[in-house]
Amino acid sequence: MDHEALRIWSKRAADWAADYHASLRDRPVRAPLDPGAVARKLPPSPPETAEPMERIWADFQAIVPDGMTHWQHPRFFAYFPANAAPASMLAEQLVNAMACNALIWQTSPAATEIEQVMVDWLRQALGLPEGFVGTIHDSATNATLSAVLTMRERALGWRGLDEGLSGAPALRFYASAETHSSVDKAIRVAGIGQRNLVKVPTDATRAMTGAALAAAIAADRAAGLVPAGVILCAGGTSVGAFDRIADCVAVAQAEGLPTHVDAAWAGSAMICPEFRPLWAGVEGADSIVFNPHKWLGAQFDCSVQFLKDPGAQVRTLGLRPTYLETAGREEIVNFNEWTVPLGRRFRALKLWFVLRAYGLDGLRQRIRDHVRWAVAARDRLAALPGVEIVTEPRLSLFSFALETDAATEALLQRINDDGRVYLTQSRVDGRFVIRVQVGSFDCREEDVMLLSKTVQEMLASCSSGPLPSR
């Protein structure tokens, strides 16, 4: 395949993409397949000779779309969204064509400088004060890992980088049980050890309070342990919990501890000023992460980390061997020194396209619609016999259940097998619940209202096949 063939096939691919998105409502959201079904359709060995693109394209159409769970489906209410707005898809086509590695300024000046400006545009959009700068990671997992590594080095007086962790004191980090599992992964990868991640008890709203955090830190200091950092939750993955950020930041500052706020999902909603009280006090944090690829339409992967003191993270992660130096350019930013990977994609272009193509007003309206529709869906589900709302909507996320875990699990299975909507599960105080999050970029009100209709039909069908009891 040469570049002239690329011209032809790119047009076909663009047509296919538009048709695919237009057809999503007619497809089941989740692939109705058993494990191994796709692999069995592929030959066991690679071809020795080139195959015509017509054959490759035909195989793609025959195998791939029906083997996918459709994350862009308007009725994808599972997990959190991974939205791809049309403007984002267009930008990614251009990025793929240029195929750059934006590891340092010299390798891609436009990628570096657009990233700097886009991060600042987002800072302004979220209402964060001047003084925060930042970078774009692939995921919140790597952003949190970067923050944890920096906290570790601060606590060790920057000795861990040279001397390793052998003989170093056990460092203690603090978070609530509502924080994402990526926090646990960061703690493990950073060599802190799972048992040194203190899960601070939460209040009735599932929030870590300043008082609870202060008590946990005091207990560790009394035991001769070394507190190193605090990780706060702003919109937990399970049911949308928010820690008392202002109170916890104040405690951390009084204790001399840095703070990192995980707002991977909910951070996007903060472009709407009315939602900002949920993360009040965030301006006092040292590090904040949110994912535009979840709710702003800048497709995966695109995770923005804001930093008050990038120098500390650069000191932790940055290396500048001779072969990566840019002569006479000491004032430039090399973003590979801010992140764990050396190689970097040109992720900022899709932000530039999305923010301009929809504007903050357009993006705000989508988020406000999603929140409003989630509340309406909650009310309709609450009116169904046997359905209990377990957690009330936090932004566009809530949960519900039936009387027993077994009945709830069976209902979830029926809903997802039906295919019109897709939901996933969590546990609240040990109870199995069904999560509902509204956030698809192309979702309409009627898509959300179909949720309660589907649940009602699945409950009614139980008369011919009862849901099991615990």
Which residues make up each language-model segment?
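Active-site C-terminal subdomain of aminotransferase-like
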Residues: 236, 255, 280-382
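N-terminal entrance/gating region of PLP-dependent enzymes' catalytic architecture
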Residues: 1-131, 421, 443, 454-455
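Conserved PLP-binding catalytic core of the aspartate aminotransferase-like
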Residues: 388-415
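PLP-dependent enzyme catalytic core of the Aspartate aminotransferase-like
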Residues: 428-470
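Conserved PLP-enzyme active-site core in the AAT-like
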Residues: 139, 143-314
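A short linear hydrophobic-aromatic micro-motif
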Residues: 132, 385-389, 420-425
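Short Gly/Ser/Thr- and Asp/Glu-enriched loop/turn motifs at secondary-structure junctions
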Residues: 130-131, 168, 390-396, 427-433
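Short amphipathic alpha-helices in soluble, non-transmembrane regions
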Residues: 408-416, 449-456
